Amino acid sequence: SIPFFGLVFFYRNAFSNKLQIRNIPFFKILIISFCWSWTCCAVPQLVSNSIFNWNITFITFIYVFAITIPFDIRDMAIDKKKIYTIPQFTGAGVAFIISQLSILCLFFFALFHSNHLLCFFMIMTNLVLIPSLKIKSEFYYLFVLDGLLVIFPIFVS
């Protein structure tokens, strides 16, 4: 966990104008995805001395990646001069498609592993993400999208 703490610390605090981690394109979403998958999947598995399941960690990483893109689309105006995100490089429409394709990949991954409950959840997630291009309400982002992350573990097995 210490390397991830260091990564987040150095991302947030710039010690030099020339070398700022946050200026590396797409790094924000990777940090968020890595930290969530590490904290929610890898650490509990390591602490419990169970057999490490890379599939759950991989699924969580991709899922958090896909769910984070709508937040980046919403924050495009705020991040414009500070942080380089996928929507700034590709535009909101292409970023949205990347998010949808990520969820679709997880759907097929779950289907391949006969996890029908996760398939159902990926379909529900895609449907919930559709309004993210138009809705800018804090309620939608705070309760609906973040709520998906809260109930996500129920469907991953």
Where is each model-derived feature located?
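Helix-coil boundary and interhelical linker segments in multi-pass alpha-helical membrane proteins
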Residues: 1, 38-58, 108-117, 155-157
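Transmembrane helix-loop-helix
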Residues: 1-16, 51, 97-144
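Intramembrane alpha-helical segments
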Residues: 1-47, 128-131
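Functional transmembrane core segments of multi-pass inner-membrane proteins
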Residues: 25, 29-70, 76
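Small-residue-rich segments of transmembrane alpha-helices in multi-pass membrane proteins
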Residues: 25-43, 88-96, 143-157
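Generic secondary-structure boundary signal with a strong preference for alpha-helix termini
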Residues: 40, 45-47, 84-87, 103
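Solvent-exposed interhelical
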Residues: 64-102
